[in-house]
């Protein structure tokens, strides 16, 4: 059982240690804790016995253990604070015109990496929740074509493919018509299901020769099922982790799954301290925070860093970036949904 004073001591030690990265002795706490040095030492010993503090090899002071950081996150971390001193820098970073969503998310990730010194990932709305709102096929040459998907009326994905040898121009038109008839307005998750269940049953109604049609569907639709992962500060991993963690971030889909898995459906923020099922991330911290993408749903900003982070400062920085990012996205999508030629 951690007493109120012991909790205060633990919080203060974490605050000092995350700023100095030096073990903390009882004398360093006396100005802030209204107790004698002996009492503080006894409380520090009690915290050590509970596994929340640990001895340092080079000093008589103590430092927070992994369990100590986990306790702090669970009992003392405030998720509502804003890093107001960095608000101007964040607003200034977004104070120019962006031409697509990916650039806005990249700016947010780059900015948070700069502020935190950590690796940052930004995710769009989960692919399975997005809806197909437009589809077209553009013939590039005699043998190649480009499938153009628009999701949520704003997110464009393209997939280049070789036109099957047995296809005529009319077959491409039939393919386009089939997609528009069966898939427009459907979620990506529903489309994924229909390609495997409904389409094999009906393609003979549309195509004289059905060879390669299912394979072509799976090929051109493959990219819309994938997460769009925006990454910044990957090299930072090498400062607080090893090569296996660095290489883990070479697989964007695994990275996205790890981040999605850290947040429950109804959870807006999550801090996981040394709590990943991925062995290469087991000694790291993952902080995830959802942000609103107007008209579409929620994206996610995630920070990966060492256990000995200044959690309060970093969460406050993420809150500021999230708020300004949402403001920028609101303006961006309001423009997309307006009449381009209307007089302002």
UniProtKB/Swiss-Prot annotation:
It holds the Pfam family HrcA. The keyword Cytoplasm does not apply. GO terms for molecular function: DNA binding. One of its GO terms (biological process) is negative regulation of DNA-templated transcription. It comes from the Bacteria. InterPro entries: GAF-like_dom_sf, HrcA, HrcA_C, WH-like_DNA-bd_sf, WH_DNA-bd_sf, WHTH_HrcA_DNA-bd, WHTH_transcript_rep_HrcA_IDD. Gene3D superfamilies: 3.30.450.40, Heat-inducible transcription repressor hrca homolog, domain 3 (3.30.390.60), Winged helix-like DNA-binding domain superfamily/Winged helix DNA-binding domain (1.10.10.10). The keyword Transcription applies. Keywords: Repressor, Stress response, Transcription, Transcription regulation. HAMAP family: HrcA (MF_00081). Belongs to the HrcA family. Negative regulator of class I heat shock genes (grpE-dnaK-dnaJ and groELS operons). Prevents heat-shock induction of these operons. This is Heat-inducible transcription repressor HrcA. It comes from Streptococcus sanguinis (strain SK36).
